[in-house]
């Protein structure tokens, strides 16, 4: 099953829950969490640790100078 199929199924399951405000808020939170996880699984996306990357990808610095400072630039590679 592809990620797009999973996303479409999640939308179809969560849409009926959006009949009340609290259910809608809950559905949106679940959907946004799913989208965040799907986004992190794409190589080259930013990350903070290996847990943000899927499969065999690891969170690595783009270049040595970018690893220094408060906001190091890291990508799933």
From Swiss-Prot:
This protein's UniProt keywords: Cleavage on pair of basic residues, Disulfide bond, Secreted, Signal, Toxin
Signal peptide range: 1-21
GO cellular component, one term: extracellular region
Distribution of this protein across tissues and organs: Expressed by the venom duct.
Compartments in which it is found: Secreted
Principal location listed in the UniProt entry: secreted
Residues of the propeptide: 22-40
Domain notes: The cysteine framework is XV (C-C-CC-C-C-C-C).
Protein name as catalogued: Teretoxin Tsu15.4
């Amino acid at each position: 099953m592809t990620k797009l199929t999973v996303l479409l199924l999640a939308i179809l399951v969560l849409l009926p829950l959006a009949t009340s405000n609290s259910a809608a808020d809950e559905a949106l939170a679940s959907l946004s969490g799913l989208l965040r996880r799907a986004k992190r699984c794409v190589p080259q996306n930013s990350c903070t640790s290996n847990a943000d990357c899927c499969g065999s990808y690891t969170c690595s610095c783009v270049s040595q100078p970018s690893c220094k400072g408060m906001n190091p630039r890291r990508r799933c590679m």
